Amino acid sequence: HEYQCLEYAIENSLPIFGACRGMQIIAEYFGSTFKKVENHISSRHKIKITGQSIFKSILNKIENVNSYHNFAIDILGDDLQTVAICSDDNTIEAIQHRDHLIFGQMWHPERENPFNKYNNQLILDFFNG
């Protein structure tokens, strides 16, 4: 059903924001492949912004993110671009679509305690365009 939701949102020009598995679904839908990774379960790491994004100014303020995943993108689908990587091992941590308002990140903003104001701002800016 996830693909049907993506297709509906794309057909109706709705924004799509995916966190963790949500990013993986977006990436898979657009033809990305995955590899197993280590040291990304219940850990934290720094991210490095690598691509252009309308959210770059906010992403640059998010230095350290949580990590709860076993898989990372191996080959990124053609319609997507890398926005951020893990500073430790260069795994892709954030992506966006080249033509549609579709953004994905591997970290969980809802698992931060207290909430990170820059994660909150990223989500607000995304949906308020």
What are these regions (language model features)?
Residues 1-54:
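Cysteine-nucleophile active-site neighborhood
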